[in-house]
Amino acid sequence: MGKKQVALPRALPPMPSTSIDEIPHSRPKKKKTKSNNNTPDDVLQNAGFTTSENNDPLSPERRKRKKKRFSIDAETSLTQNNPSIPVVLNGKDTDNQTTEEGATRKPRRRTKKTRLAEEEFPNELGVEDEDIIPDGHTKIPTQNPAFLASSLTSQPVGKLFVEKNRRFQAADRSEIIKTTEQMDVFLDVKPTWSSMDVSLTAHHIFRMVGLFCCGFLAGYAVWNIVVIYVLAGSQLTNLPNLLQTYKILAYPSQCFLYFLLVLSTVTAFDRIDLERAADALRGLLKLDPAAVASFFYFVALFLVLSQQMTSDRMNFYTPPTQNGSLWQTDTEGQILQPWIVINLVVAILVGLAWLFLSCRPDIDHSEEAMFIPEEEDYPDMEKGMKIQG
């Protein structure tokens, strides 16, 4: 009763045999391969011992233990590398050595794990913390004030230095600005002239001058016929007086009339498109002002040229009673009456032509044909393009 019984420690239950298979096996350590030269027989011979001829075994052979099944991971990792390596359980490699100890073992190669792409190729394009600049004001490193540049904006100076004659000379800024502004204004106002603009302007000027000549010709023709009828008297009874007075004016007046008539005819024909004769005739039938005026001037020019010989005879007039006279007695009426009528018709024609032109002074078909030919010269091409589209 005096002695207390000491309680024994509680024994642990035995582990089942199946738990061994579930325990993960560690990899066997590499063993140094033993050379085949150091066999037991060689060792005995070197020591001076002789082997007996008896072949009976001195000690019983060890029984081979049955190989137990290991986990799939350990078995596959060992068998794939070297099937001749023995299996190790719980690190006890002394008990599980095979009889083939002299056999050389192949060294197992360690499989290198593939590195990630991020480790092999570092991201050099990434943004570092040093590259990030905050939105606030950047700190200016402290430097010597002698080497610091002024942070103020530069102010304009009144004088500028301009290179003249390979030297820089001071000049006032305001004068330079004024000259540059004047040059800019001059360049902006000055238009750019082309050959078509020059020809079109010359055509307009000639048309205006021609219209003035047409009006002057109409007035001159009327004045001429009035002078003739005044000098001839009533019913042309005083023709010798007309010849004696008008012989000084006959030749110059007829030449001046011819000059004005030619200029007016050219101006009138310049208003119609002579390249298309059919259109000109159609305009004459439709009483187009330019076409009608051209026709009147052409007829008047033809009539004036038909009476040029009579004007020459009037210029060399001498009385029939004198020797060498080109005029015979009682022939003045036969020669002068047709000439007076023709001058009257010419005056009427040029007056009507000027009236037609003055009603439509801006009409000019030749300008449309010469300076705007693209609209009418290629109508078939435009039709072909429309058909293809």
Curated annotation (Swiss-Prot):
Location of the region described as Disordered in the Swiss-Prot/TrEMBL record: 1-116
Q: What are the TM regions of this chain, as residue ranges?
A: 211-231, 248-268, 284-304, 339-359
Question: Which top-level group of life is the source organism from?
Answer: Eukaryota
Q: Which UniProt keywords apply?
A: Cell projection, Cilium, Cilium biogenesis/degradation, Membrane, Transmembrane, Transmembrane helix
Q: Which portions of the chain have biased composition (kind: Polar residues)?
A: 47-57, 74-84
Q: What is its main location?
A: membrane
Task: Kindly give the InterPro entries that the UniProt entry links to this protein.
Answer: TMEM237 (IPR029409)
Keyword Magnesium found: no
Give the way it sits in the membrane: Multi-pass membrane protein
Mind telling me which Pfam families this protein's record contains? TMEM237
- Name the residue ranges with Basic residues bias: 105-114
The UniProt similarity line reads: Belongs to the TMEM237 family.
Name assigned to this protein: Transmembrane protein 237
The organism encoding this protein is Xenopus laevis (African clawed frog)
